Amino acid sequence: MVDWFDNFWSVYSNLVLSLGTNSLLALSIYLTLSCGMLAMANAAFMGIGAYTSSILTMNYGWSFPTAIAAGMVAPAVVAFIIGRPTLRLSGVYLAMATLAFGEVVRLCILRAESLTGGALGLNGIPQLTQWWHVLAAVVLVLFLLARLRRSKIGRAFEAIKEDETAAGLMGIDVNGHKMLAFALGAAIAGLAGVLNAHLTFFIGPQEFGFDRGVEILTMTILGGINSLVGPVIGAFIITLLPELLRSFADYRAVANGLILVLIVLFLPKGLWNPAWLRRLVGLGKKGVTP
């Protein structure tokens, strides 16, 4: 049994830990969606966290805990700076603005070759991420977000998502709560970037582009944003699909786009929708009734 597990872990450890880091990414965009914002900058925030921590551990010998903290603070600060002008937008305009920001980040990474390695990326990043780092991060983020959902802030997020104008008339600081959701989501995406960078040894600008942004959104929309379980389920499915369908690996971006369209059309509340699941179970029971 021990030998089997050792063999399994040596082959699939990166995949298993990627389930955790992708869950963090899905939860990061869940925060902004739960406040009614379609912001697509999470891949860029992941990249900022990954590059910040990698440069600090490789070039300056920072310890892993302090590099994690820096990798979370840096994207949160950037989110605060860009959030002031962009969060005045909504819907597709906000999505376009944040996508443009992601492209700016990618181009900055390409230009700063002496620091980031440019198109070649950073290689030889210390492998400091352990399985318990990922597990602890996912559990802690889930715990904090669960507390947030039940708090006054969480109720304010929900009110803003339902009707921003009405929320403002009720005395809710709409801009302040949007900024909070945006910055917290950026910090969580940065955490995922730190853990992923110190797991895979290598990061490059292509990992944090448009395709990755769509993938993160697909994870969350697929699982559903009515609960914290949904984004995690979506992250697991999107992470495992390429392994199950290796022969279609070249069409991964197409598959993500197709899944996103189908979910929006036929399951707008995602797979983890208790009402839909109850109906599905009810139909199953009727089908087996003699």
Language model features: what each stretch is:
Residues 1-290:
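Transmembrane alpha-helices and adjacent helix-loop boundaries
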